[in-house]
């Protein structure tokens, strides 16, 4: 049985009065093909809300990052249906339902702390 490693890195955006915010994440996760996994993105300043405009990016080796999810849960036309974004337990979440081998990548979360995107 093959395993698909998923790597999660988090970014913060837009310095301002909250420029000391610390973003927390799982350093890496592994899921088997067909499995489900949820990556989360938390903030030391409190609960992540839709006002943080959470973005999720996917980066495959040798490629530039591409946006999967924007403004918490909106998808681009190229985002596979198996990916979804939400808020879960005070964090931004990216859920992958039915992982495929081509989903092996690094996943980045971006949060805005200035109220601007």
UniProtKB/Swiss-Prot annotation:
Residues 20-44 are annotated as: Framework-1. Residues 1-19 form the signal peptide. Residues 110-117 are annotated as: Complementarity-determining-3. Residues 74-109 are annotated as: Framework-3. One of its GO terms (biological process) is adaptive immune response. PROSITE patterns: IG_LIKE (PS50835). This is Immunoglobulin lambda variable 7-46. The gene is IGLV7-46.
């Amino acid at each position: 049985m093959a395993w698909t490693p998923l790597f999660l890195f988090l970014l913060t955006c837009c310095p301002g009065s909250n420029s000391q915010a610390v973003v927390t994440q799982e350093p890496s996760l592994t899921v088997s093909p067909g499995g489900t996994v949820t990556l989360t993105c938390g903030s030391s300043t409190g609960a992540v809300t839709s006002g943080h405009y959470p973005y999720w990016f996917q980066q495959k080796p040798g490629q530039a990052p591409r946006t999967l999810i924007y403004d918490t849960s909106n998808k681009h036309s190229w985002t596979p249906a198996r990916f979804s974004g939400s808020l879960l337990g005070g964090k931004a979440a990216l859920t992958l339902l039915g992982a495929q081998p081509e989903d092996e990548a690094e996943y980045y979360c971006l949060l805005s702390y200035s109220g601007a995107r």
